[in-house]
UniProtKB/Swiss-Prot annotation:
UniProt remark on cofactor binding: Binds 1 Ca(2+) ion.
Function: Heterotrimer: Snake venom phospholipase A2 (PLA2) heterotrimer that acts as a potent presynaptic neurotoxin by blocking synaptic transmission and synaptic vesicle recycling. Enzymatic activity is essential for the neurotoxic effects. May act by binding in a calcium-dependent fashion to neurotonal pentraxin-1 (NPTX1) and neurotonal pentraxin-2 (NPTX2), but not to neuronal pentraxin receptor (NPTXR). Also binds to taipoxin-associated calcium binding protein 49 (RCN2), a protein localized in the lumen of endoplasmic reticulum.
Family, per entry: Belongs to the phospholipase A2 family. Group I subfamily. D49 sub-subfamily.
Full protein name: Basic phospholipase A2 cannitoxin alpha chain
Major site of localization recorded for this protein: secreted
Organism lineage: Eukaryota, Metazoa, Chordata, Craniata, Vertebrata
A GO BP annotation: lipid catabolic process
Known partners and oligomeric status: Heterotrimer of alpha, beta, and gamma chains; non-covalently linked.
């Protein structure tokens, strides 16, 4: 799911917003 993927990236980068 794109939402889960974006959330994982956001957590990995430690940013408040997802990185696409």
């Amino acid at each position: 799911n794109l939402l889960q993927f974006g959330y994982m990236i956001r957590c990995a980068n430690g940013r408040s917003r997802p990185v696409w």
